[in-house]
Every structure is written in C-alpha cells, then in structure tokens.
A protein has these predicted regions:
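Extracytoplasmic/periplasmic solute-binding protein
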Residues: 135-139, 144, 167-216, 223, ...
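C-terminal capping/gating helix-and-loop segments adjacent to ligand/active sites or protein-protein/ligand interfaces
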Residues: 363-456
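Short, solvent-exposed loop/beta-turn-alpha elements that line the ligand-binding surface or hinge
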Residues: 110-120, 162, 203-226, 275-279, ...
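A structural signal for short loop-to-beta-strand junctions that line the ligand-binding cleft
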Residues: 78-81, 87-88, 117-152, 183, ...
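Conserved N-terminal structural module of periplasmic/extracytoplasmic solute-binding proteins
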Residues: 2-99, 111-116, 293, 329, ...
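Glycine-centered hinge/linker elements that transmit conformational signals in sensory
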Residues: 173, 213-244, 285, 289
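Hinge/lid segment of periplasmic solute-binding proteins
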Residues: 94-144, 196, 283-288, 378
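C-terminal lobe and pocket-closing loops
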Residues: 269-280, 294-301, 308-405, 471-475
Length: 475
C-alpha cells in the first residue's frame, strides 16, 4: 500500500539513530540498579524523535523514554488483542485516530488540554477530537499543496502559479499532454481521493456522538460527485498516468525525468522530494491548491497526532511526553528542523520559519530545492485554509485497504484500456500481423469511478454492520 511505503521510507531514515537510543536505554537499565525513573514506552516513526527524547529527558530527569519504531496498525491491533506489550504513547495518523478513540483504546485528555484549541490550526485540532472529546495532540499537519516542475510547465507555455480552478488545471494538463508529459499520476490512492473529496466540500462520513452509529453517504454526497466527475474526465482523456503507483521507484523516476510534471500532496512533501528526486533541485515550485471554483479552501492529506493509550499505568508521565512533543516550543522546533510540517499556529506565524528558502538534507546541507522560493509561506497559507467538519470512519484503516479493490478497479480498467490502445496503435503503425495476434485482450465494458464508489459504499456498510456499528443514512 502507498501509505506503508511512505512510512517505510521514514523508518529507514531514522532506524539507525533509534537503535542507538534503544541501546542506551538498555545499558542504563542494566548499569544503574538504583534508577528510580518512571519508564514510558513510545511507538513512533518520527525521524527526529531520538533528538526530541534526549531533550525531554534532560528537562524531565524523573522520566526515561524507550523508543520503539513501528508502523502499520496491524502491529498495534495485535498487541491490543493480546493485552500485553503495549506502549504508553503512540503516534497515529489522523485518519486512524478515530478508530482507536471509538474503540476505547485512547485516553481522554480533554481536561488536560484546556486552552489549547487556539494554538493549533483548525483542521488539525478538529482531527484529534471526536464529538468534542480530545484524544491526542496534533504532531504535524499535511495541508494539501500543488507541487510542480516549473521547467516542464514553462516548456509547455504554462504559468502554474496562475492555476486556480480545476478547469485551469484541466487546460494545463492538455497542454502538457501535447509535449508528451502527464500533469500527474494516480493509480488509485485512497488518501489522495479522500483529501480531494474534502477539498471539494464533501462530507460523506459521520459517526454519532456515542460512536455507535455510522453514516456512509458516498453515492449521494455532492463533494464526492464533484471531484469524481472531474477526475473521471481527466482519466478518460488520458491526462493522468494511471499506471504509476505513488511512492514506487517508477513514480520517482518519472518525477525526476519530468515525465510527471506535478503532484498534489501534503506539506510534508518538500523533504521527500529532496530525498527521492534530488535531481529536481531548483526546478520545482509550490503553490496553493486549485479548487473547483477557485475559492480559498483546502484539505489535509496525511499528518499525525500523538496520544496516550488508556491501558497505560503511567498516564501523567505519558502525557508529559506528549505535551513536550506536540505543545512545547522546543519539542516542536526540533521536529520542524527535522522536516516535520507544524500543526501549531506559533510556528506557522514565525518569521524565521516563513522566510525559509532551503531544505536540510540527510548530510546537514541546506538545499534551495524550490529555487529560492519562500515555500513555507505558501504552505502556511495552505494550512490556514483547511476547512473543518471532515470525519474519518471509525474503521478507516479497513476502508483505505478496501478502496483498492473497489474504486481501484476503475483505475485498473483505465490502465488496461491504455495499454491495449498503445499496443493497437503500434501494430497499425508497423503493419505487423504477428504483433496483431499477440495483442492483449480488450479491457471489456468500462468500469467508472462511480461504479467503484458504489461498490466501496456497499462494502463499507457491510463491514461496519459486521463490526457492530449501526449503519444509517444520517448518523
């Protein structure tokens, strides 16, 4: 899955450092028999977490932190089911947080965070709550932005900064196609789809206040229809490369060669572009998201929070760590310096942060990847524009896995149709009768995205019912 590949990349980058931290913790535990510090276990994939832990322990000498680098909710679910080996503190992506809140796995921290609401962006603060109860603190955020290869756009005679509406984007895609380039690639990514529906004003999911009743309205939601119809048009006209899976080696190569000219992604993308497409340094720029009507609204794609598991026997120490990571200015600054995009308003309004024109690479070098652009100014505006009211499903992890086998079938049909058309055109051009005999089978009747959406909704309703939720038209 694309999310797993993304997390695996982060884990590979932090793995060696984290191993050192774990080793130090082990040595201290063996050598210092009189050590009376409270020990808390933290599960996190954040690359800068070892540095954050070091600073936290210096300021909180009564607490020792053991870091365990993990990704994938199957691990967490297995430990929850077994009832032992659980951490005290866990990092969760926003889309997964509701699942653990509804199932009673996260500690209610509402009383501990009085007055915190105005310190975070509306989108992230909304994402750590369920019906007014706060279950975690925002760690970072992923407001959507439009990243593009300016060199390629200029070759096609396009000013990407003037793309404000989806129609502008559509017209740009046609011009790029004329020079043999795709404006973007999408092989069926649930996180991208949900973010674009959110951007379009869609609110297809809702969970009742008691967490027992869930509404899935994908087939009737106006925002779902608005984006799906637009994206279907882009795919039907061959303007989106449906063959390349996000985060695949082939996708990165296409970004590097200019074959894929842009992408819609969260504000965490700059450091990943630098790491995965280093040859694009100086060529790429970022601007705000085009919207259906050109209005200034936005959505989140990605980002994570940190919460305390209700099973912990050390809630106070655990929350002190969460508070340091997500609320303390020094803890936030360390993570932002390591590449995280902030969720707090203080950092988003900081002059030094906004004036940044470089990204720090793995060797500590400052690289002007966006050609000297003050990219954080764009991303900070994007964060402020995020609309509130979006809810993820309390079984969102399952829903995203199921997306590929339902809505994903429309992408598979499009890819099969494209490959058949290319093979057919080559056969006609070359007049090769032998090649004609080896043509792939035609893809059959078209499978549209709305066909897949209908199937996805039926799957989600069936799954939710089997999980004990009351599935309703209006929760």
């Amino acid at each position: 899955m694309t999310r797993v590949r993304f997390l695996e990349r982060l884990i590979r980058r932090v793995g060696i450092m984290a191993g050192v931290v774990l080793l130090i913790s082990t040595v201290c535990g063996c050598a210092a028999a009189a050590d009376t510090r409270t020990v808390i276990r933290v599960w996190s994939w954040e690359p800068s977490m070892p540095a954050v832990i070091k600073d936290f322990e210096a300021e909180n000498p009564d607490i020792r932190v053991e870091l365990d680098i993990r990704s994938g909710y199957d691990n967490l679910n297995r430990f929850i089911q077994d009832g032992y080996g659980l951490p005290d503190v866990v990092q969760l992506e926003y889309f997964a947080l509701g699942q653990y809140a509804v199932s009673g796995q996260l500690l209610d921290i509402t009383d501990r965070v009085t007055g915190y609401a105005g310190q975070y962006t509306p989108g992230t603060w909304s994402s750590v709550q369920l019906n007014g109860t706060v279950y975690a603190l925002p760690m970072d955020s992923g407001p959507m932005a439009f990243f593009y290869n300016e060199d390629v756009f200029q070759q096609a005679g396009i000013d990407a900064s003037a793309i404000h509406t989806w129609n502008d984007y559509y017209e740009a895609a046609k011009k790029l196609k004329e020079i043999g380039v795709y404006i973007t690639a999408d092989a069926g990514d649930a996180s991208f789809y949900n973010a674009m529906v959110w951007l379009a004003g869609g609110r297809p999911f809702h969970t009742s206040g008691d967490g027992k009743t869930v509404s899935v309205q994908l087939t009737t939601d106006a925002g779902v229809a608005r984006f799906t119809e637009f994206w279907q048009r882009m795919i039907d006209e061959g303007l989106v490369d449906t063959r390349l899976t996000t985060w695949s080696d082939e996708w990165e190569q296409a970004l590097g060669s200019g074959q894929i000219a842009s992408l819609f992604a969260g504000a965490w993308m700059p450091s990943l572009l630098l790491a995965d497409v280093p040859g694009g340094s100086g060529l790429w720029r970022v601007t705000t998201m085009p919207t259906a009507d050109g209005s200034s609204t936005n959505a989140e794609n990605g980002g994570s929070a940190m919460g305390v598991l209700r099973s912990t026997r050390k809630p106070d120490a655990a929350f002190r760590f969460v508070d340091y990571v997500c609320h303390n200015a020094e803890g936030i600054a360390t993570r932002v310096a390591g590449g995280a995009f902030p969720a707090d308003n203080a950092t988003l309004n900081d002059d030094q942060f906004l004036a940044r024109t470089t990204i720090t690479d793995a060797r500590g070098n400052d690289i002007p990847y966006f050609g000297g652009q003050r990219f954080n100014e764009v991303l900070a505006d994007a964060a402020r524009d995020v609309s509130v009211g979006w809810q993820y499903l309390p079984f969102e992890v399952y829903a995203r896995n199921d997306f590929k086998s339902t809505v994903g079938t429309a992408y598979e049909w499009s890819t099969a149709a494209l490959r058949y058309r290319i093979a057919q055109e080559r056969t006609e051009q070359e007049g090769d009768d032998d090649r004609a005999e080896r043509l792939p089978d035609p893809p059959g009747p078209q499978v549209t995205m709305m066909d897949g959406i209908d199937l996805w909704q039926r799957d989600l309703i069936e799954y939710g019912t089997n999980q004990g939720f009351t599935m309703a038209d209006d929760a």
